Amino acid sequence: MPSAPQKTKSFRLQTKYVFLTYPRCSSSAENLRDFLWDKLSRFAIFFIAIATELHQDGTPHLHCLIQLDKRSNIRDPSFFDLEGNHPNIQPAKNSEQVLEYISKDGNVITKGEFKKHRVSPSKSDERWRTIIQTATSKEEYLDMIKDEFPHEWATKLQWLEYSANKLFPPQPEIYQATFTEEDLQCHEDLQLWRDQHLYHEPRRAGTRIPSLYICGPSRTGKTTWARSLGRHNYWNGTIDFTVYDDHATYNVIDDIPFKFVPLWKQLIGCQSDFTVNPKYGKKKKIKGGVPCIILCNDDEDWLKNMSPAQIEYFEANCITHFMYAAETFFAPESSSH
């Protein structure tokens, strides 16, 4: 019995190579060959092969490979229907494989001259591949995409930034201290923390050292002192793990309210190997295992915004220092800023 036409509202066939299957077809292979050759003459058909295969119940179905010189643009799903027989329609991605498949039983008729065909990567793929292989930096990569694919650049920049960061991982900038050790001073409690926990011999694996919390007035040199102690990750305003230096010996959290610090227990508790979710990026594991120096002013005192349980954890993992009146981190002879 003839099969019903495909029901689709958006059918479109654009290809030079077509593979059709007519299940339980009532038409002969010869009639189908002549019908399709005439029907596809406007697309400069140059080869057709039709194979007859019998079902177990004895009814035939026909396989058909078509090769065109001009690219088809067919929107009517009933275009290939013959005598009430409607085929399954799909592009032939590899004409040689399709011809081999339909010829397995040997019952094949052909017309025209067969040409080997295999779908090659699209021009778009080739252009993307060239960009990926030739760009030497994130900036050059994005500039090349902007020139070649302006629509993608305008509408998918967030994802392109992500792929750029995968190809060219951001390298952390090493902070260069603007003040020398002689220009700075610190309270003896802070000096003790620095010397015992930061300037120390490599500690035994699995041990954790306390973080440091400094709360006090603005423009007293807290940030300058904290950033002068060695290689570190620095966050101001927000915590962003996009660029994280695994070789840093400590982190600085500067003027960020407690409620905006994600994974604060992992950070303050000097925990190792925890997972973060960077902005515009996928989750990744952070090496961690280094203490934090938390800096804030009196109006953003973290302890005022913590529950009793949070305070208990915080004080067990962090040394707190509230600056006294007139305390400064600048040595008397240095100029403050």
Swiss-Prot record:
Cofactor note: Divalent metal cations, possibly Mg(2+) or Mn(2+).
One annotated Gene Ontology cellular component of this protein: host cell nucleus
Alphabetic keyword roster: ATP-binding, Covalent protein-DNA linkage, DNA replication, DNA-binding, Endonuclease, Helicase, Host nucleus, Hydrolase, Metal-binding, Multifunctional enzyme, Nuclease, Nucleotide-binding, Nucleotidyltransferase, Repressor, Transferase
Record comment regarding domains: There are 3 rolling circle replication (RCR) motifs. RCR-2 is probably involved in metal coordination. RCR-3 is required for phosphodiester bond cleavage for initiation of RCR.
Function comment: Essential for the replication of viral ssDNA. The closed circular ssDNA genome is first converted to a superhelical dsDNA. Rep binds a specific region at the genome origin of replication. It introduces an endonucleolytic nick within the conserved sequence 5'-TAATATTAC-3' in the intergenic region of the genome present in all geminiviruses, thereby initiating the rolling circle replication (RCR). Following cleavage, binds covalently to the 5'-phosphate of DNA as a tyrosyl ester. The cleavage gives rise to a free 3'-OH that serves as a primer for the cellular DNA polymerase.
Primary location recorded for the protein, binned into one broad class: host cell
Protein's UniProt keywords contain Transmembrane helix: no
Name recorded for this polypeptide: Replication-associated protein
Region described as Oligomerization: 163-175
Residue ranges of every copy of the CRESS-DNA virus Rep endonuclease domain listed in the record: 12-114
Family in the record: Belongs to the geminiviridae Rep protein family.
EC number: 2.7.7.-, 3.1.21.-
InterPro entries per UniProt: CRESS_DNA_REP, Gemini_AL1_CLV, Gemini_AL1_REP, Gemini_AL1_REP_central, P-loop_NTPase
Motif mapping: Nuclear localization signal: 279-289
Biological-process GO terms, alphabetical: DNA replication
Record note on quaternary structure: Homooligomer. Rep binds to repeated DNA motifs (iterons). Forms the O-complex, which is a Rep-DNA complex involved in the initiation of RCR. Part of the C- and V-complexes which are RepA-Rep-DNA complexes involved in the c-sense and v-sense transcription.
